[in-house]
């Protein structure tokens, strides 16, 4: 596996999430946020076998992210990593990482506000999501990790 800039902060991120419920990870495009973070956290003890749900703003990005994550594991989409987008879904009984779009997450929250069985919710590309805060002070109490290229 090729080394990416994000790799240097992953241990600190794992440690922080053992002690806190939230964190913000900032890194430039191509640093490895989408492809490395879910895989690095998959075996975290605090997840206790629960699912990681990663929100992507677009269907194409959700599918591509799932394909890349599955490829990194040497698997096909629908095994450990799957996706749910409008009119298409590839998940299975062993799926532990689900890449979803906003509409899918919204419907899931309406049906299950507590997100039963979900141990981690990742907002990828947070700045382009329609509900992202326009005021950065809203996120000021979150632990932020920065990665430089």
Which sequence ranges carry the predicted segments?
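Conserved P-loop/Walker A NTP-binding site and adjacent catalytic elements of P-loop NTPases
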Residues: 15-16, 21-140
């Amino acid at each position: 596996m090729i080394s990416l800039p994000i790799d240097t902060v992953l241990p600190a991120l794992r440690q922080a999430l053992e002690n806190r419920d939230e964190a913000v990870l900032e890194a430039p495009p191509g640093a490895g946020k989408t492809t490395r973070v879910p895989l690095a956290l998959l075996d975290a003890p605090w997840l206790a076998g629960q699912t990681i749900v990663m929100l992507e703003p677009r269907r194409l990005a959700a599918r591509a992210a799932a394909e890349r994550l599955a490829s990194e594991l040497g698997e096909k989409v629908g095994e450990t990593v799957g996706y749910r987008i409008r009119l298409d879904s590839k998940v299975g009984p062993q799926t532990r990482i689900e890449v979803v779009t906003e509409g899918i997450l919204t419907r899931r929250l309406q049906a299950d506000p507590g997100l039963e069985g979900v141990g981690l919710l990742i907002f990828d590309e947070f700045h382009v999501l329609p509900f992202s805060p326009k005021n950065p002070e809203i996120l000021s109490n979150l632990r932020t990790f920065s990665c430089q290229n």
